[in-house]
Amino acid sequence: MARANEIKRGMAVNLNGKLLLVKDIDVQSPSARGASTLYKMRFSDVRTGLKVEERFKGDEILDTITLTRRSVNFSYIDGDEYVFMDDEDFTPYNFKKEQIEEELLFIPEGGMPGMQVLTMDGQLLALELPQTVDMEIVETAPSIKGASASARNKPAVMSTGLSIQVPEYISPGEKIRIHIVERRYMGRAD
């Protein structure tokens, strides 16, 4: 059990008999005195895959569920299933393409470090990605000479098909760091 203001992204809650995974949280602070802060949470139903949105006051109690997190690496594709291998005991975890379609946009060829699978009582629930990923731009308009760092943005397409806005001075072939949750450009990769 936890109060709504203690819930974080990636946690699991039991709400109305449904097992929900917290995908995103928006905090809305009212300007009126005495009004309580609202937490607008977006969930993914673990069993059906449907997206659910709910609002809670900060002091509302939610039934949290303890999940097991295991570090994994991408292994191979088998038909429409993506297989991830446990880093410690090499247990394979299979996901259907539809289950992780959103996450696949951020996984470069060859995988990435920091991925985890979430399980509960041996049941595979979700794939969790790290906060950032470094990816190479495959397509964008040519860079403009003399474009300042605070100039306009332009769309850029990554090797996975992901499209994000980047500054005008970035050119194709450059590696950039992307904030996964916010889907935004953070800077050039080291």
UniProtKB/Swiss-Prot annotation:
Protein name: Elongation factor P-like protein
Family under the similarity heading: Belongs to the elongation factor P family.
GO molecular function: translation elongation factor activity
Domain of life: Bacteria
PROSITE patterns xrefs: EFP (PS01275)
Originating species: Yersinia enterocolitica serotype O:8 / biotype 1B (strain NCTC 13174 / 8081)
GO biological process: peptide biosynthetic process
HAMAP family according to UniProt: EFP
Any single GO CC term annotated in Swiss-Prot or TrEMBL for this entry: cytoplasm
Pfam families documented for this protein: EFP (PF01132), EFP_N (PF08207), Elong-fact-P_C (PF09285)
